[in-house]
Amino acid sequence: MSKPSLELKGATFTLSVLHINSSDLNAVMAELDSKLAQAPQFFLGAPLVVNLSAIQDSNFNLRGLKELLLSRQLVIVGITGATTVLSNQAKTLGLAIVKAGKQTASPPPAPRQTKVLKQNIRSGQQVYAKNGDLIIFGAVGNGAEVIADGSIHIYGALRGKAMAGAAGDTTAVIIAHSLEAELVSIAGQYWLAENLQQHSSDKSGCIRLNGESLIVESLPL
């Protein structure tokens, strides 16, 4: 019996959510451009769900927002939290109406593999630990990227980008002896350098998810 030419299966994907809090697109884009400048490769071609729950203006220019995001190589796949008027406008633009569901922590897959590196990760290098944790005995330099489907442990300074829970594991953590990162992300929730500085010093710490928000906890000496 020949294999069917297509199959329809259910799947879960982790998407970034862009919360729009102002109808002033110039102000929105100015802030977005500032964030993109800090981590351009992280957002390049990224699919986004746009949360419009703070927008009650029925004249909000959703088409303009879509075009502005596309010009920055960001892709709106749908909207959530919109009024009926904006939801109808979204449908004419070919955007899906996404209903937010309750997020529950998924247990890590078993068996869990661990990738161990005893070296510094330098600018321009990228390391990925698929289906497991990443342990680095060394520093992660500016411009370097370390990614893991599980947790990331860095026995040194984290100055580049670290993305844990890349496959959606919300129980993943990022631990480093010195938190000076350009970007940290767990299951799609991220902080840029400015966010990290607001919540942490340059000392050691553990970053994890608390609900849908990142938090950083000090490590015992």
Swiss-Prot record:
InterPro entries: CAP/MinC_C, MinC, MinC_C_sf, MinC_N, Septum_form_inhib_MinC_C. The keyword Cell division applies. Pfam families: MinC_C (PF03775), MinC_N (PF05209). One of its GO terms (biological process) is cell morphogenesis. It comes from the Bacteria. Keywords: Cell cycle, Cell division, Septation. SUPFAM superfamilies: Cell-division inhibitor MinC, C-terminal domain (SSF63848). Belongs to the MinC family. Cell division inhibitor that blocks the formation of polar Z ring septums. Rapidly oscillates between the poles of the cell to destabilize FtsZ filaments that have formed before they mature into polar Z rings. Prevents FtsZ polymerization. Interacts with MinD and FtsZ. This is Probable septum site-determining protein MinC. It comes from Shewanella oneidensis (strain ATCC 700550 / JCM 31522 / CIP 106686 / LMG 19005 / NCIMB 14063 / MR-1).
